[in-house]
């Protein structure tokens, strides 16, 4: 039986929600939210990323979108309450961006 081993990084300088494998970073009056490399490792192949629309109000731990994987669809839980001010359209167009650079170009949403 083969065994998959996680070989990712968990950068300093971010805040983490270990229960939902999400990270956030303060950027002025906004926060940037994304999935951790470990959370994406657990999800496997990401086929689609679908965030809620800009302007949506999201309570802490409630869903702000979904990722569709090879075998399931997973809800993405907000680590803080926020109103979505931007969604990563590049990651929507090419969900592999989330896996390639989860802490940079693979951010998911911004909010206030």
Where are these regions (language model features)?
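Short, charged/polar surface micro-motifs in flexible loops or helix N-caps
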Residues: 40-41, 83, 90-91
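Short, charged beta-turn/beta-strand-edge "cap" motif at the junction between a beta-strand
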Residues: 63-72, 90-91
């Amino acid at each position: 039986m083969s065994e998959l081993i996680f070989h990712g990084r968990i950068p300093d300088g971010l805040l983490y929600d270990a229960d939902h494998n999400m990270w956030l970073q303060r950027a002025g009056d906004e926060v940037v939210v994304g999935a951790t490399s470990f959370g994406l490792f657990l999800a496997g192949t990401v086929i689609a990323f679908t965030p809620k629309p800009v302007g949506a109000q999201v309570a802490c731990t409630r869903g702000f979108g979904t990722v569709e994987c090879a075998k399931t669809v997973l809800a993405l839980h907000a680590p803080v309450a926020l109103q979505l001010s931007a969604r990563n359209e590049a990651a929507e167009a090419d969900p592999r961006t989330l896996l390639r650079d989860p802490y940079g170009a693979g951010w998911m949403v911004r909010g206030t």
